[in-house]
Amino acid sequence: MAKEKVLTEQDSLRIIQEMIQKAKAGAHYERGQGPILWGSVIGFAGIMSFLEIYFKWNIPFDWWILTLVALIPQVFIVLNDRKKNIVKTHEARAIDMVWAVFGISIFALVLYGNFIGQITIQLLAEEDITLWKRSGTDGSLASFQMFVPSIASLYLMIYGFPTLVTGVVIRCRSMLIGACICYILFVVSLYTPTVWDMLFIGIAGICNWLIPGIILRRQYLLSVKTKHV
C-alpha cells in the first residue's frame, strides 16, 4: 500500500488559496464581462430609444433587439467558464440562480407588456364591454386600445434586484450604488412619461452594470497581473 503524503500547514494554506483564486476567477460578474456586456447594450438601447422618441426620429429599427443579439456573447462567456472547469462556491451558485430568476422575470415582463393590452380587450369584448375615447375637437368617439402604463418603471425596479444581491455578496460598492440609483429612478419614473422612462433605463444600464463592470474588470486584470509578477 502506497504511503499517503502528509500535507504540511503551508501546503494546506496554498491549496486553499488556489481554490479561492479559482472560485474568484470563475465568476464572470467578478471579472466584469457580464456587467460590461449588458450595461453597454441596455445603456445604448435606452438612450437611443429616448432620443428617437424625444426628437421624433423615424428609424425603422427596434433598439431593444440588441438585447437578443447580446445573448450570443453571453452564451460564449458561460461556455468558456465551463470549459475551464472552474470551481464555484455556494455563494457563486446562489448568485447565478439570482441572475437566472432575473432573466426569467425580464422575459415574463416582455410578454406582459406585449400581450396584456390586447388580451384585456378580448376579455372585455367577451363581456360585451367596449372601450371608447372621445375626441377633444369634434366630440366624436373612437375605439380605445388598452395599454400598460409605465411598464418601464417595472424594469427599473427589477434591474436593481440582482445587482444589489451581487453587490452585497461580493462586497462591490459600485454595484450597491448602481442598484440604489435604479430604485431612485424607479420612484422618479412613476411621475414621468414613457419618453423619460427610456432615458432612465439607459442611465440605469450604465450606472447599474457598465460602470461596476469596468471597475470589476480593472480589479480582475490587476489581480492577474500581480499574481504573475
Please describe what each predicted stretch is.
Residues F55-W63, F144-F147, T192-F200:
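Membrane-helix interface and helix-disruption motif detector
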